[in-house]
Curated annotation (Swiss-Prot):
This is Glutamate mutase sigma subunit. One of its GO terms (molecular function) is metal ion binding. NCBIfam families: MthylAspMutase, PRK02261.1. It comes from Yersinia enterocolitica serotype O:8 / biotype 1B (strain NCTC 13174 / 8081). The keyword Isomerase applies. Catalyzes the carbon skeleton rearrangement of L-glutamate to L-threo-3-methylaspartate ((2S,3S)-3-methylaspartate). Coiled coil: none annotated. Pfam families: B12-binding (PF02310).
Length: 148
């Protein structure tokens, strides 16, 4: 399998760059082709980059706690732009205040994200899960019609 292309960045008005650099390095070390949009990224910028590069996934991160607001409508915007089936991942400190992570995960999955990662999730696990998801999608796209 060719190295999967992923678009990463920090959404909204969030300017926390260090975690983004760590993600870029880890994903690159795990043979992802990383398109890193940096910080303060809009939904349209993620989607534009995914379309331009043929990315298999978009990885949204947020540290400042407003990811819940910044991510509203992301899946719908992907559908509207013709990439409705793209894998969407989100992680970090996604909401303000202390909440049970299962509530946060349910909320973001309800927004159309395929996986939601807590701030303390092991990045090795993240890479493994993303690769498995991407391989599964690519295999289903390659299967003859009726064999999926």
């Amino acid at each position: 399998m060719q190295n999967p292309t992923i678009v990463i960045g920090v959404i909204g008005a969030d300017c926390h760059a260090v975690g983004n650099k760590v993600l870029d390095r880890v994903f690159t070390m795990h043979n992802f082709s990383v398109i890193n949009l940096g910080v303060m990224v809009s939904q349209d910028e993620y989607i534009d980059a995914a379309i331009e590069t043929g990315a298999q996934a978009i990885v949204v991160s947020s540290i400042y706690g407003h990811g819940e607001v910044d991510c509203i409508g992301m899946r719908e915007n992907c559908v509207e732009r013709g990439i409705g089936e793209i894998l969407l991942y989100v992680g970090g400190n996604l909401v303000i205040g202390k909440h049970d992570f299962s509530e946060i995960e349910t909320k973001f999955k309800g927004m159309g994200f395929n996986r939601v990662f807590a701030p303390d999730t092991d990045l090795e696990l993240v890479c493994s899960l993303m690769k498995r998801d991407i391989e599964r999608v690519m295999q289903s796209e390659e299967a003859p019609e009726g064999m999926q």
